[in-house]
């Protein structure tokens, strides 16, 4: 026991000794660890699938330096469902202080939490498992490519889960389920979705033209691609056109057209025109099958400064005034349609025009109703007009509103009447037929022309357009009418006092004379048509087209009176003819320019308007564009099928044809289907008067009355008549050897234009017209026609 006590005492002494010493050893410093998340948090994946990115943490000491060799422990803190797993329960940190683990989501959708920890510190990851990962097509669907070649676009799908969240890490299997030929394949057959949920594969088409279907499958979800091989099929027919040759294709042939191999510089013009029975928009896509390259930008025209060659002189613009006029005309034609049987009956029961001698005399005063005009629509207008006879000729009686006395001098009124006798009536009756008196006609054998400020008052602001004059069908023997073949025309208003807008200097006497002569020629056709027209002649589009033709052919007659002997159908008038003299300019301003302005609007945007068959433009512009198209179509048919000396027989036949619709009437009179004519007229517009063609086009794709490009390209005329200042039709541009497409949402009987040009040698090209979006064949009810002209 003594030794035990001695030993204990010795130990105590020893401890005391070392405890009191100044240079003895110290305890090692304590290290504090901090763990933080680096990446992998907030991931989303499909149930049962490993997350695409590992869960990564970093361990640092109290100085912020990475700590290597430290063990990080991993554990599942919470789970939405069973069977989730970690690749390891512990991992050491590397030299960068980082440690990672992979995590596979469980079998239920929801939140999973994984806890990472080291001594004294921890961090928790929260990730999401989403149900199924539903597939949808992202891109590549509906494309067209060459048989045996790789598709220009990859086939891309996207997997999304609950709430539309992308699902990465999902295996997607791609399979060709249909092919028109052998050898169709996808590569890779299995692809994994990336962080954006997308997976893709590349398709090689089979060796034959036709549809190809590819299905993508993942986790029981499917997505289907429908694409088409067109072009490069050695066993299929090839549309081999030489420069100058053309073809008009319709029906099932539009599913795929093969063009041959081409050298650099080969060129085609392609014009697509839908001609269904129903009026409406028709959504289609023209697909070009070529090599894999992006589509070039669409070519568009550039505007040019307008010249001073204008109806209203320098600094003023012709194009606006006709808007209200055209809108009012359309309303009157719609009012007229149900009255036409009675109008014709009244014309038959009345006296023959021109045979009765009794007529109003100079100085006679009469009261007129302001027919067809309501104060509800035109609140500033009168209900009745008192007017005095100021001029009488063989065929015209001119009245002047007593409130507008002195609008013109007596000599000027006589000139107006003589112009009607010598120019307007002879031409209009030759082309469209003779009018008839109505029972109780106030001017038997003559036309009444009433100048009244009431017409001015139908407009509130001249600068926004105005109504120059009109013919009211109620005057042809109906209650509320005046029992006369008559026209209402505005009067000069140089100070603008007759409208609330007070627009001075627009309606000068000179301008009104220019406008009203043209208006009478236009409205006289409507009057004649109402009395003698049958069947389809009542349709607004063809009725208005004929009235615009009246402006033109009366202009020819006016030119002849002025000694302009070349102003006649078939003479291919060009800019130099229009600008040859002051007399020519006056004729062009008065009679021709309106039609060229209207057509210029149409050519500037043919795919953005209505053209043939329609009563009004659904996209606005007060029917400027469609009226230009209507006139051009009629002039084209007269040039193609008529003789300059006898073309009037065709217009008369068109007015009196008994067909119940205009399509059939056109077919009956011209002997070619309306649809074929409409497609070829549209093609004519893109090749007419071109001097850069590689070969002459057929005569039916040309006009004989005008050199259209020459007229528009002249800055003095194009500066007014064209929105671009020159030739306005600018087709979209695509490359023959490049896979691309062009969407077309076209109104019935309206066209879309595209130029196809080879910028490199090509082994062949395919053209397919298809439904937009689905890539399916176009619905046959749309009745599309495709005119193709090889230009180089």
Predicted regions and their residues:
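Zymogen propeptides/activation segments of proteases
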Residues: 234-411, 415-419, 423, 427-430, ...
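Bacterial N-terminal signal peptides that target proteins for export
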Residues: 1-8
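Beta/coil-rich, acidic/histidine-enriched accessory regions frequently appended to metallopeptidases
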Residues: 657-792
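The feature marks long extracellular or luminal low-complexity segments
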Residues: 20-234
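Bacterial N-terminal signal peptides
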Residues: 8-16
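Solvent-exposed, conformationally flexible loop/turn segments
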Residues: 46-50, 96, 146-150, 196, ...
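Juxtacatalytic substrate-recognition/specificity segment
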Residues: 394-539, 543-546, 550, 554-560, ...
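Acidic/His/Gly-enriched intrinsically disordered linker/tail segments
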Residues: 537-629, 656-680, 684
């Amino acid at each position: 026991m003594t030794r035990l006590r001695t030993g204990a005492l010795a130990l105590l002494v020893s401890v005391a000794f070392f405890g009191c010493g100044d240079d003895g050893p110290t305890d090692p410093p304590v290290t504090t660890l901090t763990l933080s998340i680096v990446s992998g948090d907030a991931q989303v994946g499909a149930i049962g699938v490993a997350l695409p990115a590992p869960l990564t943490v970093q361990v640092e000491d109290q100085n912020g330096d990475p700590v290597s060799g430290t063990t990080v422990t991993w554990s599942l803190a919470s789970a939405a469902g069973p069977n989730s797993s970690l690749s390891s329960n512990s991992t050491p940190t590397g030299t960068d202080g980082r440690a990672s683990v992979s995590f596979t989501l469980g079998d239920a959708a929801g939140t999973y939490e994984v806890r990472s920890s080291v001594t004294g510190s921890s961090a928790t990851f929260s990730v999401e498992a989403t149900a199924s990962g539903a597939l949808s097509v992202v891109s590549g669907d509906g494309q067209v490519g060459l048989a045996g070649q790789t598709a220009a676009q990859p086939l891309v799908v996207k997997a999304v889960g609950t709430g539309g969240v992308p699902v990465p890490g999902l295996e997607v299997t791609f399979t060709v389920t249909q092919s028109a030929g052998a050898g169709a394949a996808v590569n890779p057959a299995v692809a994994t979705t990336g962080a954006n949920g997308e997976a893709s594969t590349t398709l090689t088409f089979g060796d034959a033209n036709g549809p190809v279907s590819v299905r993508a499958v993942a986790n029981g979800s499917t997505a289907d691609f429908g694409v088409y091989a067109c072009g490069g099929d050695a066993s299929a027919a090839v549309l081999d056109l030489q420069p100058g040759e053309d073809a008009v294709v319709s029906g099932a042939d539009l599913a795929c057209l093969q063009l041959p191999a081409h050298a650099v510089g080969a060129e085609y013009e392609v014009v697509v025109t839908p001609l269904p029975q129903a009026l409406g928009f028709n959504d289609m896509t023209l697909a070009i099958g070529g090599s894999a390259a992006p589509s070039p930008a669409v070519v568009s025209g550039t505007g040019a400064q307008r010249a001073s060659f204008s109806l209203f002189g320098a600094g003023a613009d012709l194009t606006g005034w006709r808007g209200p006029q055209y809108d009012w005309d359309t309303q009157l034609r719609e009012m007229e349609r149900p009255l036409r049987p009675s109008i014709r009956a009244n014309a038959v029961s009345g006296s023959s025009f021109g045979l009765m001698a009794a007529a109003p005399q100079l100085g006679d005063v009469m009261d007129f109703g302001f027919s067809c005009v309501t104060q509800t629509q035109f609140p500033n207008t009168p209900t009745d007009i008192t007017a005095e006879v100021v001029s009488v000729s063989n065929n015209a009686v001119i009245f002047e509103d007593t409130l507008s006395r002195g609008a013109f001098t007596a000599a000027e009124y006589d000139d107006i009447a003589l112009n009607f006798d010598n120019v307007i009536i002879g031409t209009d009756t030759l082309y469209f037929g003779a009018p008839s008196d109505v029972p109780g006609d106030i001017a038997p054998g003559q036309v009444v022309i009433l100048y009244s400020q009431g017409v001015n008052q139908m407009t509130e602001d001249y600068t926004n357009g105005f109504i120059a004059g009109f013919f009211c069908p109620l005057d042809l023997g109906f209650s509320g009418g005046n029992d006369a073949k008559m026209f209402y025309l505005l009067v000069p208003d140089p100070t603008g006092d007759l409208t609330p807008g007070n627009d001075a200097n627009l309606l000068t006497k000179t301008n009104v004379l220019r406008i009203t002569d043209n208006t009478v020629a236009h409205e006289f056709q409507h009057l004649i048509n109402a009395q003698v027209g049958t069947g389809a002649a009542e349709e607004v589009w063809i009725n208005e087209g004929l009235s615009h033709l009246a402006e033109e052919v009366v202009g020819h007659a006016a030119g002849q009176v002025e000694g302009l002997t070349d102003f006649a159908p078939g003479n291919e008038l060009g800019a130099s003819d229009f600008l040859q003299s002051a007399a020519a300019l006056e004729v062009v301003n008065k009679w021709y320019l309106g039609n060229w302005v209207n057509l210029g609007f149409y050519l500037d945007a043919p795919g953005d308007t209505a053209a043939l068959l329609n009563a009004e433009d659904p996209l606005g512009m007060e029917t400027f564009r469609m009226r230009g198209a209507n006139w051009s179509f009629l002039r084209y048919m007269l040039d193609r099928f008529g003789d300059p000396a006898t073309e009037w027989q065709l217009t008369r036949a068109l007015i009196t044809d008994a067909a119940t619709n205009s399509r059939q009437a056109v077919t009956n009179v011209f002997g070619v289907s309306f649809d074929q004519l409409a497609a070829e007229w549209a093609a004519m517009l893109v090749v007419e008067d071109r001097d850069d063609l590689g070969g002459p086009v057929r005569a039916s794709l040309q006009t004989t009355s005008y050199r259209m490009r020459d007229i528009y390209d002249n800055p003095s005329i194009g500066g007014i008549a064209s929105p671009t200042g020159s030739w306005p039709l600018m087709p979209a541009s695509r490359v023959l050897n490049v896979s691309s497409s062009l969407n077309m949402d076209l109104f019935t009987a309206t066209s879309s234009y595209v130029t196809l040009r080879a910028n490199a040698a090509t082994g062949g090209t395919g053209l397919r017209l298809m439904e937009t979006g689905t890539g399916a064949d176009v619905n046959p009810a749309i009745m599309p026609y495709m005119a193709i002209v090889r230009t180089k």
